[in-house]
Amino acid sequence: MSRVRLEVCCGSADDVIQAHRAGADRVELNSDLFHGGLTPTLGELIVAKRETGMPIMTMVRPREGGFCYTAAEFDTAVEDAKLLLRHGADGLVFGFLHPDGTIDLERTRVLADLAREAGKESVFHRAIDVVPDWRKALDGLIALGITRVLTSGQEPDVALGTGTVREMI
């Protein structure tokens, strides 16, 4: 049986360094974890990568408060994603929804394609936990080539959503 990889959610370069020292296999780098995680600064990514050399997935989320973004917010996310990939990100973590709660496949495709073209991973984050039909959503993400999904099984706590997570796998 293969060993489970340990990925740690980090809010700073210091967090990444500590996770690396503690044996994490990879990290997800964010800023503002208090608000669910936002796009980290390039400086945090550069320092974390330089100090650890470990795989770093980076959150691409322009603001707190849901997963429906204006055109300008989405354009900001795209530009951030390009810069993060150019400066060492090993993948992008993101989630885009329509106002009705369904996945915005067009916007999701844009970031998935950016990651794929750079030879990196794309992870759809916990926005999947608020979609009305996770099965349909998951099928759409698979069709787009999304590498992984970050979920708590449509519950606030993964311990409560374990059954759904098992179904998703």
Residue positions per predicted region:
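N-terminal pre-domain/capping segments
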Residues: 1-27, 32-39
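Active-site mouth loops of central-metabolism enzymes
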Residues: 2-12, 60-78, 97, 122-134
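Hydrophobic faces of well-ordered beta-strands that scaffold small-molecule active sites
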Residues: 4-10, 27-29, 48, 56-60, ...
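Active-site-adjacent beta->alpha loops and helix N-cap segments on the catalytic face
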Residues: 13-17, 33-57, 72-75, 96-116, ...
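Glycine-enriched alpha-helix->loop->beta-strand junction motifs that scaffold or abut catalytic
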Residues: 21-27, 51-55, 88-91, 116-119, ...
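Glycine-rich phosphate-binding active-site loops on the catalytic face of alpha/beta enzymes
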Residues: 25-38, 83-99, 146-158
